[in-house]
Each structure stands twice: as C-alpha cells, then as structure tokens.
Design a protein with these regions (language model features):
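Hydrophobic, membrane-embedded alpha-helices of multi-pass small-molecule transporters
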Residues: 28-45, 187-192, 201-262, 278-297, ...
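Membrane-interface loop-to-helix entry segments
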Residues: 147-188, 203-204, 244-247, 346-357, ...
C-alpha cells in the first residue's frame, strides 16, 4: 500500500486548469533545465549572427549582458514565482487580472498564436537542415522541403503532446547535443575565419544599442508570461525562483556569442547557410534538429495549454488533442513562408507580451499573491494593455526611443495600478476585491 501511495504521488498532474499539488512540486533545477532547453533555440543563433553584423563581436557584449542579466533574469524570476505560488499556468493566472472571458479569448489566443509562430519558424529551419543532409536545394525543391519539414514537425510535437514529464527527459539529452553543435561551430569558425578576424570584425553600425536589446528581448519577453507554465511544478519560494532563470542566462549568453562567432563574415542570418559555408559535416545538421527540439517542446506545450484554456478543456487527454491539432495548424504556417518574416514575429511578440506581463505582474502583487478565478471582463486591464501596446508601437516605429518592450511593460503596469486603485475607491466591483 505504501509503495502504491508513493507511486501515486509521483504521477505528474498535467491538467491545464488544475493547480499542481504541493506534494508533486520538484527541485528548482528541473524547470531550470527546461528553461535552458527553451533558450537553446536556433533563433538565438540567428539573432547572434545578425547582431555581429551590426556591432562586431566586442560591440555585442554590453547588449547581451544588459538584456540577459538586467531584464530577462528579473522578468523570469517574477513570472516564475507567480506560477510556483499558484500552481497554475499563465493563461489561467491571467483570469484574475483580465477576467476569465478576456483571458480566454484574447490572452490565451495571443500566447497560443505567437507560440505557434515560433514553433513554425524553427520547424522551417529544421526542414532546411534536413534538406542539407539529403543534398536537396531547399530554395528550389519546395516539395521535398515540405515533406522533410512535416517529418521534423511530427517528431518535434510528440513529447509536448504527451506532456510535461516527457519534455523534461527529452531536454536531458537534447541540450548536450546542442552544446556539441556549438563546440563544432566554434571550431570551424576559428579554422575557416580565424580568431583575429572574428575579434576584429567591424559591424555596420546599422542597429542601435536599444534596438539590439529589443531584438533579443523580443525573443525572450514571452518568458515573462509563459514561465508559469513550467514553474507551476516547482516549490513556491523566492530563493528557488531567483535561481531558476540561471537555466536561461547560462544557455542564452553563450549561445548568442556562438551564433555571432559562426556568423562573422558570412553576411547572412540563415543558420543553415552559415553552417554550409563553414563546412559542417552532415551529422551537424542532425544535431541542429536535436538542439531545436528543446525550445520546440516549450513552444508547442505552451500553445496547447493556451488553447485548452480558451476552449475550456480541463483534462490531460483534451490538452493532448488540442496540442496535436495546433501542431497541424503550425505546420501550415511553415508553408506560408513565416521564416522570411522572423523580424515581424519578433516585433509582434515585443509589442504584445510586455503589455500582458505588465497587467499580470501588478495584479498579482496588488493582491499579495492570492489568486482567485474572476468571471467576466476587466476593462481596466484592457485599457492598460492598449496603453502599453501603444507606447511600445510609438517608441518602436514612430518616435524611436529607449527599449520599447521594457517601456511597454512599465507603462502598462503603472497604468493598471493607478486605474485599479481609482476604481477601487470610486466604483468598486469584483475585480477590485482584495485591492486596498
């Protein structure tokens, strides 16, 4: 009987709407490893290749360190604590500040669609890599590329359809494979280009410091919202949540520099083209697929959770079905040429995620970390989010100033705090309950 009870306790609850019980919470290193897998993405290598073209190798050092240590670490720690404290996924936590209707049909949709976009981008890159292995010119033979992309996508999706427990074990062997890829990439770059040429490489100066930070943050800012999807399996203490982003920083910083070193002098951000130019062996492209697998799991799993919340799916079986259907739709996105629109996807994420995070952060701490499912639609959250998105858009495209994602998050948070405080005094309702 004792063994049966112990076995029952170790079974992971993966229902999208159910808080993870405290007796099933894990050591902080488990979600940290998953975060490392999330950060270990082909997209980050591509961003590194882009940044060295603008800044040179020495010039990207302050950009990378500031983004990861001052912004990414802090945002992830806060978001992670929210998930650990409540045991809930991000799209469910959002119900308190936004109201269940808004969280279902706007927040879950935004998170789900952008996660689909990221998944489609990296699956497209992997299709390119498989074509390189098979000696197929993926720029000409699109039928063969589509077939290889479908195969890669199906394999990518299987662990995320199964659930959290299989994702953890996949990362345990996929991350080392990605590290091997990077080591070989550095070796070939040094062999073909030479360290002196890499270190002295001069960037074009076409991208400002703030724009470089925004580019990196555009990829990572989604974590300010979705971290809770994985930290809900962790213990709810601040120490663990401060340590947990180590997985992101320890992988992200080196990976960006590796992408930069590999891309020096190549004149392209297409990582497959860069690898071909460097003379990567065939197995390197297979390892590229393995490295991409880690972040693909997170993108697909988050997409499934978000759409499950939107459709009010409450079982693990239902979540798995939703994730599988979402995978099919994501494959269709691959064939629309989303890889050529990577910068647009980064910009969209940089506009939407900070505004969502701003409301969620402030609402959570206004209520002192006590979560309650709020029915309806909180228009104060809508107003704050619109203000934040507007600030992000204006400072990105019209009056280019500062770091738009950070500004959007801060302005959204301040706006939400002020109008909720005023509403609590002037016209209190269920959304102002618990706000003093």
């Amino acid at each position: 009987m004792g063994k049966e009870l112990e076995k029952e306790k170790t079974v992971i609850i993966d229902d999208p709407m159910t808080p993870v019980p405290l007796n099933q919470r894990q050591h902080w290193t488990a979600p940290a490893f998953i975060f490392g897998g999330l950060e270990f993405s082909v997209t980050l290598l591509m961003i590194g290749s882009t940044l060295i073209g603008a800044f040179g190798l020495k010039g990207i050092i302050p950009v990378v360190l500031f983004t990861f240590i001052c912004l990414t670490w802090v945002g992830n720690a806060i978001s992670g604590y929210m998930g650990a404290k409540t045991g809930l996924s991000s799209s469910v936590i959002a119900k308190q500040g936004f109201g269940d209707k808004q969280a279902k049909f706007i927040i879950a949709l935004v998170i789900g669609v952008i996660s689909m976009g990221w998944w489609a981008v990296q699956t497209s890159v992997t299709g390119n890599a498989f074509c390189a292995v098979l000696g197929i010119d993926y720029t000409v033979n699109r039928t063969a590329w589509m077939i290889t992309t479908i195969v890669a996508g199906i394999v990518f999706a299987i662990p995320s359809v199964i659930g959290y427990s299989s994702m953890k074990w996949t990362d345990y062997f996929a991350v080392p494979g990605g590290i091997l890829l990077c080591i070989v990439g550095i070796y070939l770059a040094l062999k073909n280009i030479g360290w002196s040429n890499i270190i002295s490489y001069k960037g074009s100066g076409e991208i400002s410091f703030a724009a470089g930070v925004t580019m990196i943050l555009g990829m990572n800012v989604s974590q300010f919202v979705i971290s809770a999807d994985y930290t809900r399996y962790a213990k709810p203490c601040w120490k663990d949540n401060i340590l947990r982003p180590i997985g992101i920083v320890a992988i992200g910083i080196p990976l960006l520099f590796i992408g930069a070193i590999m891309g020096a002098g190549n004149g392209t951000a297409d990582i497959v083209a860069v690898m071909e130019n460097l003379g990567f062996p065939i197995w390197g492209f297979i390892v590229l697929w393995l490295a991409a697998w880690t972040s693909q799991l997170v993108n697909n799993y988050t997409m499934g959770l978000s759409f499950s919340n939107m459709l009010n799916i409450k079982t693990n079986k239902g979540r798995a079905i939703v994730t599988a259907v979402g995978t099919f739709l994501s494959l269709l996105l691959c064939f629309t040429g989303i890889l050529e629109n990577l910068q647009k996807l980064l910009s969209l994420a940089a506009l939407l995620y900070p505004a969502i995070a701003g409301v969620m952060f402030v609402d959570f701490f206004l209520r002192k970390g006590v979560w309650e499912d709020k029915q309806g639609w909180n228009f104060m959250a809508t107003i704050a989010m619109i203000v934040g998105i507007a600030v992000g858009y204006i400072t990105t495209y019209i009056v280019v100033i500062g770091i738009p994602p950070a500004q959007s998050l801060i302005i959204t948070g301040i706006t939400y705090y002020v109008i909720m405080k005023v509403k609590a005094k002037v016209a209190p309702d269920k959304f102002t309950e618990g706000i003093n």
